[in-house]
Amino acid sequence: MIYQMQMPAKIDVDEATHTGSFGRFIAQPLERGYGVTLGNAMRRVLLASLPGTAITGIKIDGVFHEFSTIDGVREDVPEIVLNLKKVRFKSNCKRSCKTTLTLAGPKDFLAGDIVAQEGEFEVLNKDLHIATINSEAAVTIDIYIGRGRGYVPAEENRSDGMPIGFIAIDSIYTPIKNVKLTVENTRVGQKTDYEKMILDVETDGSISPDDAISLAGRIINDHVTFFANFSPTEEEYAEEEYKQLDEEFENMRKKLQTKIEDLDLSVRSHNCLRLAEIDTLADLVSRREDELLNYKNFGKKSLTELREALEKEGLKFGMDITRYQMKG
C-alpha cells in the first residue's frame, strides 16, 4: 500500500435528476486539487474518446458534388449534409454499413426514414428534419454509416474505394452531448480544505450516463496502469521508500489509538480528560489548546504536562488526523 491519501468513499448519483440521458455524479472527499485533476480527465475522455455511430458519407443519384442542388427538393445538398450530421444512432454493430433509401414526393424526409436493412442500427432522433421533397420528385440516396470515436472530419472519411459521387461528411461519433464539471469545497471532520467533484453528463440516449462514466473511468485506468506498473532503474529504492512510508503511516495510526490511561499522567490530568470524554491520543491531538482550557478544572499546569507528553510521542495539539482514521 502506497502512502495513504484521502479517497472518495463512493460515487453518489443524484436520483432526483437522473434519466436515461442525464446523470449528475458526485465524488467526495478528494484531496485539494484532485477535483480539477480527475474532473478534467473524465470530461476530456467523455467528450472525445467514447465510441459511437454516425453517418460517414452519402451518394445521391444524379448528384456529383456537395455543392449541388436537387430538382424537386427544397434544400440544397450542403443543407441536407448539415442535417444528416445531427442524426443520432444506437448500434452495437462494430462494422460499417450502408442503407439505400428511395423517397418519392410529396414527402418530408425525416431521420426516422433511415432504416437499417439488416437491423444494424436504430435512429434515436426520428423526428429530425432532413429535406422536403415535392410531389414531382423522387430521390434515391445511399447512406454510409460507421463506428468511431470523437469527431472525424470529412477528409478522413474519403477513400479511393468509394463510388463516383460519394460525398464525405464530418462524423460526430461521440454519444456525449455535454459534460459540466463543478468543484466545490467540502468538509471531512474538522478539516474544510477537501473537494467535492460534480460531473453533469448528458448523452444522446445511445448510452446511459452511468455506462458512459464507467467506460470513461476504464479508459483512464487502462492508460494510468502503464505508469503504475512502470519499473525504473531505481525500482528497489522506490519500493523501499514506499515501504518506509507505509510503516510510518501504520505506526502513526497505532500510536493514535493509544489509550489515555496508558500514558504516564497525573491523576488530575487523567480525571480532566476522562470528564471531557477524551479516551485516546487521537481524541487528544485533534483538540486545540484553547479548547482544553475551556474544560472544567483544566488549567495551564495540566496543559503543559499534556504538551510535554505529546512532544515525547512526536505529536502536538490541533493535528489533522483524518487520513489515519479507519474507514467504516
UniProtKB/Swiss-Prot annotation:
Keywords: DNA-directed RNA polymerase, Nucleotidyltransferase, Transcription, Transferase
InterPro entries: DNA-dir_RNA_pol_insert (IPR011262), DNA-dir_RNA_pol_RpoA/D/Rpb3 (IPR011263), DNA-dir_RpoA (IPR011773), RBP11-like (IPR036603), RNAP_asu_C (IPR011260), RNApol_insert_sf (IPR036643)
Catalytic activity: RNA(n) + a ribonucleoside 5'-triphosphate = RNA(n+1) + diphosphate
The keyword Nucleotidyltransferase belongs to this UniProt entry's keyword annotation: yes
Protein EC: 2.7.7.6
Region entry Alpha N-terminal domain (alpha-NTD), spans: 1-231
Alpha C-terminal domain (alpha-CTD), as annotated region: 252-328
Any Pfam family: RNA_pol_A_bac
Enzyme class: transferase
Any GO BP annotation: DNA-templated transcription
Highest taxon of source: Bacteria
GO CC terms: cytoplasm; DNA-directed RNA polymerase complex
Family: Belongs to the RNA polymerase alpha chain family.
Role summary: DNA-dependent RNA polymerase catalyzes the transcription of DNA into RNA using the four ribonucleoside triphosphates as substrates.
Xref: NCBIfam families: PRK05182.1-2, PRK05182.2-5, rpoA
Record text about domains: The N-terminal domain is essential for RNAP assembly and basal transcription, whereas the C-terminal domain is involved in interaction with transcriptional regulators and with upstream promoter elements.
Subunit structure: Homodimer. The RNAP catalytic core consists of 2 alpha, 1 beta, 1 beta' and 1 omega subunit. When a sigma factor is associated with the core the holoenzyme is formed, which can initiate transcription.
Protein's recorded name: DNA-directed RNA polymerase subunit alpha
This protein's encoding gene: rpoA
